[in-house]
Amino acid sequence: MFTYYQAENSTAEPALVNAIEQGLRAQHGVVTEDDILMELTKWVEASDNDILSDIYQQTINYVVSGQHPTL
């Protein structure tokens, strides 16, 4: 049996958001929060890996909750 423990201070979400932001900025020049959320949503839907899907979903929650600095 596995027990899930929420990390106090996770660094995965900000790092993933920053990577997505850099990639989208290189492609489009301008990035909004909606752009990042749409990209993460595509990744969740395209992933066959439950662990990655969970990470992407947690990152969506992180962005929506307003924890990420304004773009």
UniProtKB/Swiss-Prot annotation:
Protein name (Swiss-Prot/TrEMBL): Protein bdm
One protein family per Pfam: BDM
InterPro entries in alphabetical order: Biofilm-dep_modulation_Bdm_put
Entry's Gene Ontology BP terms: positive regulation of bacterial-type flagellum assembly
Organism in which the protein naturally occurs: Escherichia coli (strain K12)
Induction annotation: Expression is reduced in biofilms and is repressed by a high salt concentration.
